[in-house]
């Protein structure tokens, strides 16, 4: 019933915008070879950027640990105590992550944006990366102690989500920086595609790792998986005062 109601609401919204939005004729080129050539030139210009190979590796592995964690964390929260999980109900999990976690994630992103605007990305990227990755250790603690106190669990989730939002700000700003110049919008779209690949591929084998080693050892593996992303920061070339308000 819920999804049916949502589909009806989306249909009504689409119909409304179809009627209300102005209809303008746009000239479109049907020359497929020209479109392919433009696509090729944009792609080529992206891969000819200075130190682009380092940038691509960084984008791919910055969230290597978190890409695995995000797939398994919900299962850990909902799994029974006998299976090594926390045994939360769907309602409890939804409140902790959907409400508290989302709020802390947003606040972390806002705080990160404010700090970068004041002092620039170069000064903060290491600290933001650490803020994203170090809180992952709360899952190691929870998998070891299996706390039943919902306030404690909620607090740990908030810490991890705040750190994630805080650290993700630097990640986005870096992609914006390397996308600057001609075709910046297209180049940023390429970056987001690479970013999505960096989330999808590690998530594909995270379940297999968890089933083989259990929750506790899996979360230790997640901590170890965050190290390559931290190391890559050493090789990045970041513009002085980039992101800082002038």
PLM features per residue range, with description:
Residues 149-170:
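Hydrophobic core of transmembrane alpha-helices in multi-pass small-molecule transporters
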Residues 25-55:
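Juxtamembrane intracellular "pre-TM" segments in multi-pass secondary transporters
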Residues 130-148:
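C-terminal ends and interior cores of transmembrane alpha-helices
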Residues 8-27, 232-237:
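C-terminal membrane-cytosol helix-exit motif in multi-pass small-molecule transporters
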Residues 178-211:
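A late C-terminal transmembrane helix in Major Facilitator Superfamily
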Residues 107-124, 210-211:
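Helix-to-loop junctions at the C-terminal end of transmembrane segments
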Residues 166-180:
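Intracellular juxtamembrane helix-capping segments at the cytosolic ends
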Residues 62, 71-94:
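Short amphipathic helix-loop junctions that connect adjacent transmembrane helices
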